[in-house]
Amino acid sequence: MLPRTKYNRFRNDSVTSVDDLLHSLSVSGSGGKVSAEPAASPYLVSGEALRKAPDDGPGSLGHLLHKVSHLKLSSSGLRGLSSAARERAGARLSGSCSAPSLAAPDGGSATPGSRAPAASMSATRKSRASDEPLPRPPRGAPHASDQVLGSGVTYVVKYLGCIEVLRSMRSLDFSTRTQVTREAISRVCEAVPGAKGAFKKRKPPSKMLSSILGKSNLQFAGMSISLTISTASLNLRTPDSKQIISNHHMRSISFASGGDPDTTDYVAYVAKDPVNRRACHILECCDGLAQDVIGSIGQAFELRFKQYLQCPSKIPALQDRMQSLDEPWTEEEGDGPDHPYYNSVPNKMPPPGGFLDARLKARPHAPDAAQFSGKEQTYYQGRHLGDAFGEDWQRAPTRQGSLDIYSTPEGKAHMVPVGETPTYVNTQPVPPQVWPAATSSTESSPRKDLFDMKPFEDALRNQPLGPVLSKAASVECISPVTPRAPDAKMLEELNAEPWYQGEMSRKEAEALLQEDGDFLVRKSTTNPGSFVLTGMHNGQAKHLLLVDPEGTVRTKDRVFDSISHLITYHLESSLPIVSAGSELCLRQPVERKP
C-alpha cells in the first residue's frame, strides 16, 4: 500500500487512477519489467476488468485500495511464475488480439507492434531450446562395450607434453608411481606457458624422483587434441588436420593416473613409443573430464582382459609380443640389475602360485628334469628346442611371450658330468626374435593397482598353457613338447637296418666310433621316443636328433619319409648333413653286433 500524507483540506488528495498509475510504473525503470500475461496466474486481474469496475469518483478510497491490492497480487504472481509458464502465457497473449496491455495508458488493446516483440521473443526461446544438446550422461558412467571395443571413445583435451621416465614403473611400488606422475604434472605445467599448474607452492622434488624423471618434450604443448580410447590403443591426434601426435598400444602402457585431489584436471599415463621411449604424457581435462578419461582407460583395459580370457588365441600374446621384444623401446632395457628378482637374490623364495605351479599343472606327465647350468643347448636343424631333445635332456627355461617360464624337477635329478657332455653339431646361435633376454624375469609386485596395465601376466600364470604351447612348438619350436612315440612300422624298419643299434647311451655310442665318417643310429635312453644319429667328424663325436617334436623326419632343407630314407639318401649320394656351419658325412656304418 502506498504511503499517504496527512490529510489537508487545502491539498488536492484525489488519487490517480489505476491506469495512470500503471503508466507511470511502466515508464519508470522498476515498473518496465511488468508484463501483461492474463492467464498465467489465478491472481492476475486484467486491466479491462479493472476499468469495468464502477468508478465511485476520484476520491473513493475503498475503490483505490481494491484496485491497488489486485495490482500487487498480479505482480507477485508474475514473479513466482516459471520461465516455461511465462513463455506459454506470452504465446497466448500474442495469439489473442483482444488481450489488453496493462502498460497501455489509454486502456485500449495492445497494438500489433507491441505484440511483435513478444512473439519474436517466444519464437527465439523455442528455437534456442530445440538447439540445446541432449543432457550428458552422469560422471563416471561406463560407455557401451561395443564402442570401446570398436572405434573407441573420443575426448577433446589439451596436450601439455611429456617427460622422460628413466626407470621401469614395474620396479616401483604404487606410492612411488603416484609421486612420479604428480611430479611429472608439476614440471610440465611449470614449463608450459599459460598452464594452470598443478601446485601453487610445492616442495622441491626428492633425489629419488629426480633420478627417475628426465628431459621433457614440449613439441605439441598447449595444443587441443582428440584423445581416442579403445581396447587397442590410446590415439592422440589434432582435431583439424588429423595429424597423429602419438599412438600408444595398450601393451606399451604401464601406468595411468588422473583426477587426484591435488590434480583434478590432469591425467598422466606412462607409455613407450619410438620417439620418446618411456615417457609420462600429460593431458589437461577441464570441467571434471579427468574422471571420465581415466574411467574410460580403465574400462578399455578391463574389456581387453575379458576378451583375452574368453578367447586367448585372438590376443597377440606370443608371436606379436615376441617380435615387439626385438625393438629396444618395448623391452625393459637396463632394468635387470635394479630389480630385486627372487632368482637373483640369495635365499629369496619365489612367490606362491607363480610360474612353477602353472607349469606343473600344464605338464603333469613330463619326464624327469633337473636344473643345471653350463650345458650346451640343443637345436634341431636351426630351431631352438631348449634342452628338451638333447641326449640327457634336463628341461631348459622356456620363453612364453614376454615371460620366463621355468619348470621344476619332478623326479630324481640326473646330472651329467661336464666332461662327458659331447659337442652338438646343430648348435647355431639363437635368433634374437625367438629368445631375447633369457635372463630377465617378471617381478611380482606386492601391491596391485587398478592401472598397472599388465593384466596378461597374471592371467598367463593361472591359465592352462597347453594350446598356446602347442602353437609355439609348431611355429618356432620354442616349447619343450614330448616327442611322439614311434609306431610299430618304424621300429620294424629300423630293426632291419644294420646301422641301428637299438637303445644305447651316448657314452657307449661314442666308444664304437673309430674314424671320421663312422655313424650309427640309436634310441635315446633318457628321452623316450627320440632317435639320435651319432657320427664322427674331425675326430669329434656329433649327435643329431632325427625326428622333430611333431614326428617328422627331416633335415634343415628336406623332409624324408623315414629314418631309413634319410640315412640311405645321404649315404648313397655322399652329401653331408649341414647344420650351423658344420658337416657330418656318412661313410662307414657301424653295424650292430649280433
From Swiss-Prot:
GO cellular component, one term: plasma membrane
InterPro entries: CEP152/SHC-Transforming, PH-like_dom_sf, PID_Shc-like, PTB/PI_dom, SH2, SH2_dom_sf, SHC_SH2
Pfam families found in the cross-reference section: PID, SH2
Tissue specificity statement from the Swiss-Prot or TrEMBL entry: Predominantly expressed in the adult brain, in the hippocampus.
Region of interest: CH1: 335-498
Key words, A-Z: Phosphoprotein, SH2 domain
GO molecular function terms listed in the Swiss-Prot or TrEMBL record: phosphotyrosine residue binding; protein tyrosine kinase activity; receptor tyrosine kinase binding; signaling receptor binding
Domain of life: Eukaryota
Stretches the record annotates as Disordered: 95-147, 428-447
CDD domains xrefs: PTB_Shc, SH2_SHC
An example Gene Ontology biological process: cell surface receptor protein tyrosine kinase signaling pathway
Coiled coil: none
PTM annotation (Phosphoserine): residues: S402
PTM summary: Tyrosine phosphorylated.
Domain (PID): residue spans on this chain: 149-334
SMART domains referenced in this protein's UniProt entry, alphabetically: PTB, SH2
Sequence ranges assigned to domain SH2 in this UniProt record: 499-590
Quaternary structure (record): Interacts with the Trk receptors in a phosphotyrosine-dependent manner. Once activated, binds to GRB2. Interacts with activated EGF receptors.
PANTHER family in the cross-refs: SHC TRANSFORMING PROTEIN, SHC-TRANSFORMING PROTEIN 3
Function, in words: Signaling adapter that couples activated growth factor receptors to signaling pathway in neurons. Involved in the signal transduction pathways of neurotrophin-activated Trk receptors in cortical neurons.
Protein name: SHC-transforming protein 3
